[in-house]
Regions:
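Metal-associated gating/positioning segment near the N- to mid-region
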Residues: 1-55
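Active-site flanking residues adjacent to catalytic metal/cofactor-binding acidic residues
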Residues: 5, 167, 226-227, 326, ...
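Conserved, mostly hydrophobic/aromatic
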Residues: 33, 78, 136, 166, ...
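Conserved phosphate-binding/catalytic loop of the ribokinase/pfkB sugar-kinase fold
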Residues: 84-109
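Active-site core of metal-dependent hydrolases
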Residues: 108-236
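His/Asp/Glu-enriched, well-ordered alpha-helical/loop segment
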Residues: 186-195, 215-226, 232-324, 328
Length: 341
């Protein structure tokens, strides 16, 4: 396959851009993501205080300049802060802000390399979203609906401002009703908008729900991501209510406190230990293929071609042809990862 591109990854294994907010966390992601089949990615932030998001941006600038070996950092995906607290999911409610174009301009101007500001998740129904979306459209920043209570009509209206897709489709958004299609219905209806699916495990989105989207949208309008966080790198405590586990920093270890009372400790710097904490990109691909009717060409589109086109990186990524970066992910006939180049 052309190298897998993860456009929604907060962290992986021994590095977490979201939790640690350091250049070293990104270097760790560059180093270890190839073990998961990923050759390039967008470091993804969360709904945090603005100054902390700006710290992330500066770290991304630094690592992009260094261009370390491993997976290439293509830029930043700003997941927030302009999201709806009603659908905050695991984001901080106090950091879910009303869209403000002045704040957006401040974030954008923090980037030394403006091309790194590639993607933003936003709740388009909130006051001020139109101005932020116009700004993003003018500066070639891809935008997606996410953590949103938007109605079908609100999304229909905001598409004029460049809305291109939906973040972790069906999760963290207003559901479908036959008289008000909601955010989820809009995701299925607008055939020119991308549906991003995060770590298609069957846990956050059932396999049947994914299959439904696949039948309606087709493989050319789906992007597979992981939304991995690098959970072992939590700086205090992170409650993963879907998996019913709390990740608690305990000196130089991380304690996994299961809701049923079971506890286990892992070393957050031990790659072999922490890689088991979250499903990798390569495992997600295999899992998706095991439970749906996707073919090899579909996988290529969802993992490489579509994400490259979506974030305007298809001049060098996403396909195998002369002049493109020679990023390759090699899997066997069972879709087990062999190696990457």
């Amino acid at each position: 396959f052309p190298g897998f591109i993860d456009i929604h990854v907060h962290g992986w294994a021994t590095g977490s851009f979201w939790f640690e907010k350091t250049s070293q966390s990104l270097r760790e992601m560059c180093r270890t993501l190839p073990f998961a089949g990923v050759t390039s990615y967008l470091g993804t932030t969360g709904a945090d205080p603005i100054e902390e998001i700006k710290t992330c941006i500066r770290a991304a600038d630094q690592v992009s300049e260094e261009d370390p070996e491993g997976a290439q950092l293509l830029g930043v995906h700003l997941e927030g802060p302009f999201i709806n607290p009603v659908y905050k999911g695991m984001q901080k409610e106090e950091c879910c802000l009303l869209p403000d174009v002045t704040v957006m301009e401040d974030l954008y101007n923090t980037f030394k390399n403006k091309k790194l500001c590639r993607h933003m998740t936003i709740a388009p129904e909130r006051p001020g979203a139109d101005a932020v979306l116009r700004f993003c459209q003018e500066h070639q920043i891809q935008t997606a609906v996410g953590h949103s209570a938007a109605t079908f009509e609100e999304i229909k209206k905001m598409r004029a401002y460049g809305l291109g897709g939906f973040t972790h489709t069906f999760s963290g958004m207003k559901g479908f009703h036959h008289r008000e299609l909601g955010t989820a219905g809009a995701a299925l209806y607008f055939d020119d908008m991308i549906c991003e699916f995060a770590k298609q495990t069957g846990m956050t989105v059932s396999h049947e729900a994914f299959e439904l989207a696949y039948r309606i949208k087709g493989s050319s309008r789906i992007v597979l991501t992981t939304d991995c966080c690098g959970l072992a790198q939590t700086q205090s405590c992170f409650d993963h209510y879907v998996r019913k586990i709390r990740f608690v920093k305990d000196r130089d270890q991380v304690c996994l406190e299961h809701y049923d009372g079971k506890k286990e400790w892992i070393d957050p710097r031990d790659y072999q230990a922490v890689k088991q904490v979250e499903m990798s990109y390569a495992q997600s691909v295999k899992n998706m293929a095991d439970h749906t009717k996707v073919g090899l060409y579909d996988i290529m589109l969802m993992t490489s071609f579509n994400p490259a086109h979506y974030i305007h990186a298809d001049d060098c990524k996403g396909s195998i042809r002369p002049g493109m970066d020679a990023d390759l992910t090699i899997m066997d006939q069972n879709l087990d990862l062999i190696c990457v180049y």
